[in-house]
Amino acid sequence: IIYFHYVKEYESRSSVKTEGFYTAADKGRYVRNMYNHRAFGTLCNKCVRTELYKKNRIYFPKYSYAEDCYVTTQLAGYASSIERLDEVVYHYRKNNPSSITRQGRKRRKNEYAMNFLDLYEKYRDVPLSENPVAVIFDDILIQAGWYSIAYGLDLYTKYPYLAEGIRKARIRGGSDVWLPMQVLVKLYSLFR
């Protein structure tokens, strides 16, 4: 994988999006940072060798929201080489009124959680040594629990394993879910 910076074009301004520095040696950190929005989980700022898709089973999401991150976390987890091109290469237009990101917040959060719970289901039985996304399992479960509580999504009913998975998950910094909310999610899951 070669990744690079990009420019996000808004209607009246533009913003350079600079990616941090990652290598294959710390791809677990890269995968976790992509999931937790501390690195770009987009495909638009990456070049990926076709061989990475052919050599590994790369799954594609059921829902539209966060589809890039769903794929890039797998690709980065499998990559034997990750290099940064320290240049702006791509321009991303943000002013598309029909964009998926213009959906209502509840719908976006629901699709995000369901996509990544699907990814969790696909990889949960894969041995750690072969698992490209195991590093984000706790984040996936806790975030789904948080979204279920905060947005009234009823994910605990739809995914019966969710409460038990959250009870086993570790509370960690660097997550999109604030530490006190992670504690709340774990407590809530004790009674599910």
Language model segments and positions:
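Donor-binding/catalytic cores of nucleotide-activated saccharide
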Residues: 1-83, 92-108
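Generic alpha-helical secondary structure signal
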Residues: 43, 48, 52, 87, ...
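Structural motif
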Residues: 128-137, 171-178
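Catalytic core of nucleotide-sugar-dependent glycosyltransferases
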Residues: 88-96, 102-128, 143, 150-165
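Membrane-interface aromatic/basic loop that binds lipid-linked glycans or pyrophosphate carriers
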Residues: 149-192
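Amphipathic alpha-helical repeat scaffolds of TPR domains
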Residues: 135-147
